[in-house]
Amino acid sequence: MIGYLRGKIIEVMNDSALIDVSGVGYEIHASSNTLGDLQALLGNDIIVWIHTHVREDALQLFGFHDKEEKNLFLSLLKVNGVGPKMALSILSGGRPAQIHEMIEAGNAKALSGLPKVGKKTAEQIILTLKGKLVSIEEGGVVAKAKSVAHTQITSALLNLGYKSQLVDQFVSSLPADIAVEDGIRKGFQTLSGGLS
């Protein structure tokens, strides 16, 4: 799993960017906000936070200019009916702090004004995430009371293709001090048959 890439921005396209890391070009999909930030830094060395999305027929890299956007993206993936492409579209509609504020305020009207978000999706986002995100401060948007191990286990199981709801239920049942390897191993045993 790739956590971040450090390299030079070679090209910025409509919905993706090309980053040269030690002679290898990685294409990352990103929100229009991140792409705008990267365009301004074209030719410079940068760090881009990465979410690796694995499907049966593809491996895609989603990039974020900061951790706040990445964490909000991962939270949006927990919403039923929101996949990576829709989550990027939502993030293209505003900065993480603005979207977070809409969710916490229960403002379905404002959320439904974001790209590709209808009334039902906006309501589902609020139902799933309201009260489960802490305020955006120096550390960004993070899930409440989640240990580092739980976060890593969740990320690993989602990257392996397990369904978000099953992963969340499973991880919430684990002790906070569990070793990451043990959690992933138990996840394989418990969630077999739960691939998307």
From Swiss-Prot:
Protein's UniProt name? Holliday junction branch migration complex subunit RuvA
Q: Which superkingdom heads the taxonomic lineage of this protein's source?
A: Bacteria
- According to the record, the residues making up region (Flexible linker) are 140-144
| Compartmental location | Cytoplasm
NCBIfam families per record: ruvA
Extract the ranges annotated as region (Domain III).
145-196
Function of the molecule: The RuvA-RuvB-RuvC complex processes Holliday junction (HJ) DNA during genetic recombination and DNA repair, while the RuvA-RuvB complex plays an important role in the rescue of blocked DNA replication forks via replication fork reversal (RFR). RuvA specifically binds to HJ cruciform DNA, conferring on it an open structure. The RuvB hexamer acts as an ATP-dependent pump, pulling dsDNA into and through the RuvAB complex. HJ branch migration allows RuvC to scan DNA until it finds its consensus sequence, where it cleaves and resolves the cruciform DNA.
- Residues of the region (Domain I) are 1-65
Q: Which InterPro entries match?
A: DNA_helicase_Holl-junc_RuvA_I, Hlx-hairpin-Hlx_DNA-bd_motif, NA-bd_OB-fold, RuvA, RuvA_2-like, RuvA_C
Q: What are the record's GO terms for cellular component?
A: cytoplasm; Holliday junction helicase complex; Holliday junction resolvase complex
**Single GO MF annotation:** ATP binding
Name the principal localization, coarsely classed. Answer: cytoplasm
Q: Which GO terms describe its biological process?
A: DNA recombination; DNA repair
Q: Which family would the database say this protein is a member of?
A: Belongs to the RuvA family.
Domain comment, as recorded: Has three domains with a flexible linker between the domains II and III and assumes an 'L' shape. Domain III is highly mobile and contacts RuvB.
- Fill in the subunit field for this protein: Homotetramer. Forms an RuvA(8)-RuvB(12)-Holliday junction (HJ) complex. HJ DNA is sandwiched between 2 RuvA tetramers; dsDNA enters through RuvA and exits via RuvB. An RuvB hexamer assembles on each DNA strand where it exits the tetramer. Each RuvB hexamer is contacted by two RuvA subunits (via domain III) on 2 adjacent RuvB subunits; this complex drives branch migration. In the full resolvosome a probable DNA-RuvA(4)-RuvB(12)-RuvC(2) complex forms which resolves the HJ.
Q: Write the record's keywords in alphabetical order, separated by commas.
A: Cytoplasm, DNA damage, DNA recombination, DNA repair, DNA-binding
